Regions:
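Structural motif corresponding to the C-terminal cap of alpha-helices
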Residues: 162, 201, 337-341
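Eukaryote-biased recognition of intrinsically disordered, low-complexity regulatory segments
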Residues: 1-11
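Iron-sulfur-associated redox domains of electron-transfer enzymes in respiratory
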Residues: 4-5, 15-81, 85, 209-582
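Charged, low-complexity surface patches
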Residues: 14, 137, 147, 190, ...
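Short strand-loop junctions, especially beta-strand C-caps/beta-turns
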Residues: 9-11, 181-183, 233
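Fe-S ferredoxin-like electron-transfer domains
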Residues: 48-193, 199, 206-221, 225
Length: 582
């Protein structure tokens, strides 16, 4: 690798050729502030917060886009630069609604943090109300342009990572704003509800719809039995909201916190993930033996499902008819559990804690009501749960570790790894391989489908049958894979798709991390590692060996793929098209 020598703040630096000033400075522990930059996604130098002085240059250079060169001398924090950044922040604030005390991102806002760092405690510039309206037309998020700073992160992630491109930069000059085409509400676009825009927004211009009031109301209603289930990835991310290191598994504290919030039963959605594998594995074997649309494509990610319905409706028949683990969880609570506990399903409120904003959309879909009631009543994100814990005065890091309640409290390691890209595929392969061969796997790991690569492929020999599989995450990668399948360039039997790059660990509802962290930390790998570590430490690592799952089928469902299982655990999809029903 070729390198260049330069100086940053009089410190000698050896940086890779082609590196930016921002990256070179990071190598020697120098932080240059940014607001718009996202590594490999949004490098446009628009916010002007990262500008530096380069000796001999005519003007200031944006560190996020300026490549280093041999002999370059850079200064990142001179008095002039401090004044420049402060003025830039004041100008940004002149068009920003500063209701910081009541803002949902207060103390978690990148703009607020930079204003604090640069001493912006008052604004010299007159504010102007640009008359923007809040768009709350979708069930999963709220868009508030009065808090937009035009960093364009959302535009970049929607176009580059997620292929959808439903938001863009409109108008010019002072009238520039982020909007959908023709200023339409999101509900009239092909938005897939993934929430990646909310994950990268540095302010509260994009945020998930807050459904915590619905949960508080249920918890305070003595006529309701309120049951909660967190998704696999939540245990690996919730700790970040309370200052714990990225990738810390807080499962025990999560359970303790949910009990202290007042939930009547604290169950594990991972158990439903094991049920998903039983149903989806059976569906795969049926299509391989009896015929059916191939490849079978997973259906756990509601953002992916909506993307397929809008952008690739020709693949809708390839989708597994299995509900997602969230929806299976709710359906089983209101059928199987209600019968065992002697409860009227009408008096049960099922709350899910998800890494995903699209789950808010999913709970309102048609075909998600096993007993004529919504399978899941309320879905909140990891961030919303953290807010509830704070509001209740619960000191999360000091909580003891507790265990899930019985019946839906035992899950396999296969269920845990659902939260990482490739996890659903690996969990399915563990079960399908043993069913087909009749032999126990020497090792349950399928390393070929692990990792954060956008597209992964593998071929396995299952009792003489060659099974080709593919795993993809991020909808732009999914589009590439589907195009290859459609053209005949690639052929698979089984495909896993997750809407969010890296899978649920990088979901739109996960804890916010600043650009400083996102640009120089492998968030996805650190978070996924917590799930894989939990799996490796378990003796129960295969879905079909879960005693709760065995009992469920023996007592109630009969067998995977039975008529009753199809009624409760399976669903249908809609070919929406780009301009069809949202």
């Amino acid at each position: 690798m070729n390198t260049v020598n330069l100086k940053i703040n009089n410190i000698p630096v050896v940086a890779p050729e082609g590196a930016t000033i921002l990256e070179a400075a990071h190598l020697v522990g120098i932080r240059i502030p940014t607001l718009c930059y996202l590594k490999e996604i949004n490098a446009i130098g628009a916010c002007r917060i990262c500008v530096c002085e380069v000796k001999g240059a005519r003007g200031l250079a944006a560190a996020c886009v300026m490549p280093v060169s041999e002999g370059m001398e850079v200064f990142t924090n001179t008095p002039a630069l401090q004044r420049y950044r402060r003025t830039t922040l004041e100008l940004i604030l002149s068009t920003h609604r500063t209701d910081c005390l009541s803002c949902t991102r207060s103390t978690d806002c990148e703009l607020q943090q930079l204003c604090r760092e640069y001493g912006v405690d008052m604004n010299r510039f007159t504010k102007k109300d640009q008359g923007y309206h809040t768009d709350a037309s979708m069930p999963h998020l709220v868009r508030d342009n009065s808090k937009c700073i035009l960093c364009r992160r959302c535009v970049a992630v929607c176009q580059k990572n997620q292929y959808a491109g439903v938001i863009e930069t409109c108008e010019r000059g002072y009238d520039t704003h982020i909007a959908c085409a023709f200023d339409m509400p999101l509900s009239e676009t092909a938005c897939v509800a993934c929430g990646q825009c909310t994950a990268v927004c540095p302010t509260a211009a994009l945020r998930e719809r807050d459904d915590t009031d619905k949960v508080w109301a249920a918890l305070n209603d003595p006529t309701k039995t309120v049951i909660v289930g967190p998704a696999p990835s939540v245990r690996a991310q919730l700790g970040e909201c309370f200052g714990m290191p990225i990738g810390t598994n807080v499962e025990g504290k999560l359970v303790a916190a949910l009990r202290r919030l007042g939930f009547d039963q604290v169950f594990d959605v991972d158990t439903a993930a094991d049920v998903t594998i039983m149903e989806e594995g059976t569906e795969l074997l049926h299509r391989l033996k009896e015929g059916g649309p191939l490849p079978l494509i997973t259906s756990c990610s509601p953002g992916w499902i909506k993307f397929c319905e809008h952008y690739y409706p020709e693949f809708v028949d390839n989708l597994s008819s299995c509900k997602s683990p969230q929806q299976m969880f709710g359906a089983l609570i209101k059928t199987y559990y209600a019968q065992k506990a002697g409860l009227d399903p009408k008096n049960i409120v099922v709350v899910s804690v998800m890494p995903c904003t699209a789950k808010k959309f999913e709970i309102g879909r048609e075909g998600q009501s096993a007993v004529g009631l919504p399978d899941v009543d309320v879905s909140i994100t990891t961030r919303e749960l953290a807010d509830m814990i704070r509001r209740a005065g619960i000191m999360f890091p000091e909580l003891p570790d507790e265990e899930f309640d019985p019946i839906f409290g035992i899950a396999s390691g296969a269920g845990h790894i659902f939260g990482a890209t490739g996890g659903v595929m690996e969990a399915a392969l563990r079960t399908v391989a043993e069913i087909v061969t009749g032999k126990e796997l020497a090792r349950p790991e399928f390393q070929e489908v692990r990792g954060i690569a956008g597209i992964k492929e593998a071929e396995y020999d299952l009792a003489g049958t060659k099974v080709r599989v593919a795993v993809t995450s991020g909808l732009a990668n999914a589009a590439k894979l589907l195009d290859r399948i459609k053209s005949g360039e690639a052929e698979y039997h089984f495909v896993e798709v997750m809407a969010c790059p890296g899978g649920c660990v990088n979901g739109g509802g996960q804890p916010h991390q600043s650009g400083d962290v996102r640009n120089f930390t492998d968030l996805r790998s650190l978070r996924a590692a917590a799930l894989y570590s939990e799996d490796e430490a378990m003796t129960l690592r295969k879905s079909h060996e879960n005693p709760v799952v065995k009992e469920l089928y023996a007592e109630y469902l009969g067998e995977p793929g039975s008529h009753l299982a199809h009624h409760i655990l399976h669903t249908t999809y809609v070919k929406r098209g780009l301009y069809g029903k949202n």
